[in-house]
């Protein structure tokens, strides 16, 4: 994990932010317990590299004015057309305090389901967790090939270590396996009924 170099900024206008984005910089805000909001800028390429290695909800090391710290990537805003990062929110991590974050669910075994003429309907792709900063996973893998037609997968089915607590309702549905033919015929019947 590299140390990202944040540059403190004073200018708060949107005109300034657009100018900086054209120059390859991303504006951002840093906040947290006992820290007043701090506006900064960072190189887009440098930030993109770090996000690709830590994930969109990971922990980064950064330095500002020569001091090193850790922060949680709280929010990344992207341009809807170019998908370039246009703003980033960082939350300062104080020591080894427990943090809350969203972690992507990585579904494994989808090709097994499609080979059997079924489809995986994903209801959720993120799970909210609570843990120590050093224990935050980049993603949580979930093998759906164990299920069959009609299977419903819930947050309670996710396998996480004792050090990680799931904050979402454990009865909540994250995915289900449906019959593709049945689903398309139901959609066809709905379209006929609408006409």
Question: Residue spans of the language-model regions?
Answer:
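Acidic, negatively charged sequence tracts
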Residues: 1-195
């Amino acid at each position: 994990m590299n140390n990202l170099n944040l540059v403190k900024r004073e200018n708060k206008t949107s005109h300034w932010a657009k100018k900086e984005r054209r120059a390859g910089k991303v504006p951002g805000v840093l906040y947290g317990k006992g820290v007043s909001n701090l506006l900064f800028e960072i190189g887009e390429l440098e930030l993109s590299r770090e996000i690709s290695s830590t994930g969109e909800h990971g922990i980064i090391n950064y330095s500002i004015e020569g001091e090193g710290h850790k922060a949680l990537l709280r929010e990344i805003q992207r341009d809807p057309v170019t998908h370039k990062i246009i703003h980033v929110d960082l939350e300062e991590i104080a020591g080894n305090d427990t943090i809350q974050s969203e972690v992507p669910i990585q579904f494994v075994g989808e090709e097994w389901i499609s080979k059997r003429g079924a489809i995986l309907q994903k209801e959720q792709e993120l799970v909210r967790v609570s843990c120590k900063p050093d224990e935050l996973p980049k993603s949580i893998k979930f093998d759906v090939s164990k299920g069959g037609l009609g299977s419903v997968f819930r947050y309670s089915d996710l396998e996480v270590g004792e050090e990680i607590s799931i904050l979402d309702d454990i009865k909540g549905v994250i995915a289900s396996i449906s019959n593709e033919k049945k689903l398309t015929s139901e959609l066809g019947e709905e379209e006929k009924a609408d006409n």
